[in-house]
Amino acid sequence: MKNRARRVIFSICTYTLLLLGLVGQIIIGGSNLQGETLKKEKTEASFQDIWSGEWQSNFENYLTDRLKIREWLIPIRNQIMYSLFKTSPNGNIIIGKNGNLYEEEYICFETQIYPPMTEDEINILVEKLTVLDKSLKDKEKKLFIFITPSKAEIYSEDIPVRYLKIAPDEKLPSTYNLFIEALNQTDIAYYDSTQDVRNLKQTSEFHVFPRTGTHWSKVTAAICAQELSDSMEKQLGIELPECKVKYQKCKEPLHPDSDIYNLLNLLEKPDEIFYEPIIEITDTCKEDYTILARGGSFMGSSLNRLIQNDYFARSYYMENTFAVCPEGVYSGNFDTYDSLPIQEMIEDSDIIFLEVNEEAISRMSFGFIDYLLENDILELP
């Protein structure tokens, strides 16, 4: 009787799961999964692949990826890993102390698991910037550098202990400190938002970097955008609009405040209080300057906010591998700088703006500086 009861229970569970899978396959809509959930593409069969078993394996993955119940099972599995075992289901996202999430790369640079740049390497970079600055000044143009902070530096106290154990005990001078020291020996105009963010962390009611994001919060970015504008006015001798930044709580996170939390594909909503900036333009007086900006994702919620509020007459905006230019020039993804009319963009611009995160100084501007110097782009008519 016991064996029969077990078989009945097993059969009921099996058929229930099959029924749920069938119902899920019918009623579940498009995928809402994010991050590492790319589906396998169907591959053509060849005799060699069939003989080796590779085609069968690929076809099995192809069918598995298209089971719509997968969209239920992945968040359930991920939530169990995250809540019960405090384990990240995404290998690139690290769960720190106090539930603070990090991208591993930022931790490795901050702890010097990845060694910092040497003083000679920094000097070579700053020498290139000095040459660029002089060349632009000769053409009556202006160079401005914008330095943005790393979450792993601002919230270093929440880095997991296991990274501190494998980091070197004796720290070398950091890339960031060497870079600032070298810049201070030049006449290059720059705004370092890192110290302002450190100070804001001590006084604000919100997290300057949300626990759920890898970037600074929308409010932090707006406050630093205001400081950036003031710094550009003072150092470049130009006039830009003035604004005041306030903030209020919001029910849902604004991008990018939960960007890496979303990549975990969990069932629960993030346990974080989110805020949204309220920006009031108090003075619209400005001079008609055209800006060419090159940088990474931290630029998207800071400088781009100034651009969207018409701080500049025109803008050529290059963030990572995406460019937004005036109508008729170019907008979209680009693989190389040769895809863009860089010479014409430089010629039309008054300000060349370079953003760099303190973690990314070693790859500053994604080769843009070298491209300008090595291709005689600054030899304008």
Task: Name each region found by the language model.
Residues M1-P381:
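Extracellular glycan-modifying ectodomains
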